Amino acid sequence: MRISSRFTIAVHMLTAMEYFKGQYKITSEFLASSVCTNPVVIRRLLGKLKEANLIKVSRGTGGAVLTRDATLITLYDIYQAVEEDDADGALFIFHEHPEPLCPVGSCIHEVLDPKLDSIKLALINEMKATTLAELVNKAQTINLAKSNSN
């Protein structure tokens, strides 16, 4: 389990799609301007999100929409859609050759692996518990507070 910028960009994209639903046509150019990246990056991720059945994309400049309610899309769904599955599923990358004759190096995996596994499980559970709707609501709340303070 490795988490790249593909994940945070995809979360940004889907949050924007829901946030601006009905106000703007959600195109790759529109999303690229929000993310501040090249539309090609956005189109690649749109393809992965479509493959995972999280979005529907209309041909041409028809735009993209979510295929289900934002309350039913979790961060873990998005992660699974855009991140490559690595062979070992490790979140943390260990240095390859700890010194086997060192009292610490010889047992560092036994010391640290259970804790790292717990951390990974907690991360996955938090991702599964966090919905896209929560993120959209938070963005709306923040923007409302900003507009009220001006």
Give the label of every model feature segment.
Residues 70-96:
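Conserved segment of winged-helix/HTH DNA-binding domains
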